[in-house]
Design a protein with these regions (language model features):
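Conserved AMP-binding/adenylation subdomain of ANL enzymes
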Residues: 215-236, 240-346, 356
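Conserved ATP-binding/catalytic segment of the ANL
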Residues: 435-500
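Structural core segment of the AMP-binding/adenylate-forming
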Residues: 57-58, 81, 85-167
């Protein structure tokens, strides 16, 4: 079903029922007790109408902001569909945000109602509700909330989603005509969502995304990847509060009639994959890195013949992939060897993903080239995309039949990407889908964009909007990149750039990705701005350390945040030196300290999209960082 630029979010599912699937077909799958249970289009749309009816009875009007602080689940979809068809605005809040940030977002957006996912989050909302004057209803998605609600004596009404739906059903017949009329009156230019960017610095900013932003992005992504059909099953586990999962999974499924299954948690993702057998998944690179690390560890730890077979299979897969990607036909011998590798090794790894994956969509951060190549060797396609919350999000994505590892793919249709010289502000090149040339390469600069996927602006922040979108309509991403073999290639964020004391520019992300090839390193944070050389805070792999040194869990519960024992430092340093040879001398780590446990969202060190907050970490560990440099000078 071809989308037009007149499409709106509430039209998508109804068009699927009209043109693709009968309303009794399965739209969503949810784990209930031990099995995944189907939820039909009819159930979804009926619940949306009941929720809309309740909203109308309680004075909700077009343009009102409605909140979510809930994990991925069918209830999210019911609530969202219910508000979208009235022209209301989805404000999804990361469950991991601090009380202060949640309170700020509720008040900045002037939320009226909020759907809550867990008892812990309900407790948080009850605590901050007295400070949120526009909030009228807190809606737990669970029924056993009364005991907790008794601790609250304010004016905000607390009732479960089931109670809300039942109440709305009583007046649905009366409200039905109004709901249908309001749905038809939603315009593409109307605001659909405020997505508050976590950012690595500063106060959260509400990115204003319209129905046109979302639906246009879905349309052109399906043009770029026409292999997504109405028969797909997506497994959703990245947060729907993030624009990547919202567009690449939820909205794609709404538009294309694909099924969407919800994972129970990241910890149970592997189990859920075996149960759901997804054909498509949207992931972040960190998950792929973990799968790669585990597969390599399992494949090489057995020793003897098994390890030889595993390494031979990976090498064979690499040879086969390189031939295919060069546009040639593999020899009969290589094809036979590839089939043997598939039977002995690759099929067993694929089984752990459910066995039916056509491809994986990777986004949210740059995918290290070696990780893309590893999955390519197995015969699992990784389609890497690039974008930001402000671009709805996709700007470029890998084509199904053209893999250039280390790039984020071809410019999507109907947008223009420019590369701007950071110093002179001269636009070096402008590229579109139609100007694509597989041999084209450009100089490096800031990535800028024009198109229907660019946000309307930042909520209540006209100055920030004017900074981000210039007078010629270019949105400035703050990312550094270039074109390579016709595809867009990302270097790093401009604000991440380190300038050493010799004036040399150092982009930390590609350097960090080089060291993250090591199975001894779990996380790494580069330091070196205005310093003579590069140093790092390294979080060693807990699992591999425990195995190598026979450590107990108590070792990682020590109050000292850092590990000082030389045997552990030397163990990590072996791999630091090993991977340093891949880098220029000024990019190499000269010294490092070992952090006992990972950087986390809960400690305020990472964003919800798992990016380290550089300024926060530098400030938090300033003493340890300074000591590391002083030690170097003393030596």
């Amino acid at each position: 079903m071809k989308l037009t630029d007149q499409a709106t979010i509430p039209q998508l599912l109804r068009n699927v029922v009209k043109y693709i699937h009968p309303e009794t077909d399965t739209f969503m799958l949810e784990k209930v007790k031990d099995t995944y249970q189907p939820i039909s289009y009819k159930t979804t749309l009926d619940n949306a109408d009941r929720i809309s009816s309740f909203f109308l009875d309680n004075g909700i009007q077009k343009g009102d902001r409605m909140g979510f602080i809930v994990e991925n689940c069918p209830e999210y979809v019911f609530f969202d569909q219910g508000l979208q068809q009235l022209g209301c605005v989805n404000v999804s809040i990361y469950p991991t945000l601090s009380d202060d940030d949640v309170e700020y977002i509720i008040n900045d957006s002037q939320l009226k109602m909020i759907l809550v996912g867990t008892h812990f989050l309900l407790k948080k909302l009850i605590k901050i509700a007295p400070n949120c004057p526009t909030l009228t209803h807190i809606v737990p998605k669970f029924d056993d909330y009364q005991k907790m609600a008794q601790t609250y004596s304010g004016d905000v009404c607390i009732l479960s989603l089931n109670e809300l739906i039942a109440t709305g059903e009583k007046t649905l017949e009366h409200n039905s005509a109004t709901i249908n009329k309001m749905r038809d009156e939603v315009k593409p230019s109307d605001l659909s969502s405020l997505i508050y960017t976590s950012g690595t610095t500063g106060t959260p900013k509400g990115v204003m995304l319209s129905h046109l932003n979302f639906c246009h992005n879905v349309k052109v992504c399906l043009m770029q990847i026409p292999h997504i059909t109405s028969e797909e099953t997506f497994l959703s586990f990245l947060p729907l509060s993030h624009v990547f999962e919202r567009t690449a999974t939820y909205h794609i499924c709404c538009a294309q009639g694909s099924k969407i299954a919800f994972a129970q948690s990241l910890e149970l993702l592997g189990k859920n994959m075996m149960e759901v057998h997804p054909t498509v998944m949207s992931v972040v690179p960190r998950l792929l890195e973990k799968i790669n690390e585990k597969a390599m560890k399992n494949g090489t730890s057995a020793g003897g013949l098994k390890t030889k077979i595993f390494l031979w299979s990976i090498a064979t897969g690499s040879k086969y992939r390189n031939v295919i990607e060069s546009g040639k036909t593999p020899s009969m011998l290589l094809s036979m060897q590839r089939n043997i590798a598939e039977k002995l090794v690759f099929s067993k790894i694929k089984e752990k993903t459910g066995g039916n994956l056509k491809f994986i969509i990777s986004g949210g951060a740059a995918l290290p080239q070696n990780i893309g190549e590893f999955f390519g060797n197995l015969g699992i396609k990784i389609l890497e995309g690039y974008g930001l919350t402000e671009t709805s999000p996709v700007m470029a994505v890998t084509e199904f039949d053209r893999q250039i590892y280390g790039t984020v793919g071809r410019v999507i249709p109907e947008v223009t990407i420019g590369i701007q010289d950071a110093d002179t502000k001269r636009i070096i090149t402008e590229q579109t889908y139609d100007t694509f040339d597989e041999n084209f390469e450009s100089a490096e600069g800031e990535i800028i964009l024009r198109g229907n996927n660019v946000m309307q602006g930042y909520w209540n922040k006209p100055e920030d909007t004017a900074q981000a979108i210039d007078t010629d309509g270019w949105f400035h991403t703050g990312d550094v990149g270039k074109f390579y073999k016709g595809n867009l290639k990302i270097t790093d964020r401009i604000k991440n750039m380190l300038v050493n004391s010799f004036g040399k520019n150092v982009y930390p992300t590609p350097i960090e990705n080089t060291y993250l090839q090591s199975n001894r390193i779990d996380q790494i944070f580069l330091i070196g701005d205005k310093r003579e050389h590069i140093t790092a805070i390294i979080v060693p792999s807990k699992e591999n350390m425990m195995e190598e040194f026979g450590l107990k869990e108590s070792f990682f519960q020590d109050n000292d945040l850092f590990i000082h024992d030389e045997q552990f430092t030397e163990w990590v340093d072996e791999h630091v030196r090993k991977y340093s040879v891949e880098l220029a001398k000024f990019e190499r780590i000269k010294n490092f300290i070992l952090k006992r446990n990972p950087f986390t969202i809960e400690d305020g060190e990472m964003t919800p999209t798992l990016k380290i907050k550089r300024r926060i970490v530098e400030k938090k560990f300033a003493v340890e960082i300074d000591e590391m440099y002083l030690l170097e000078e003393a030596e």
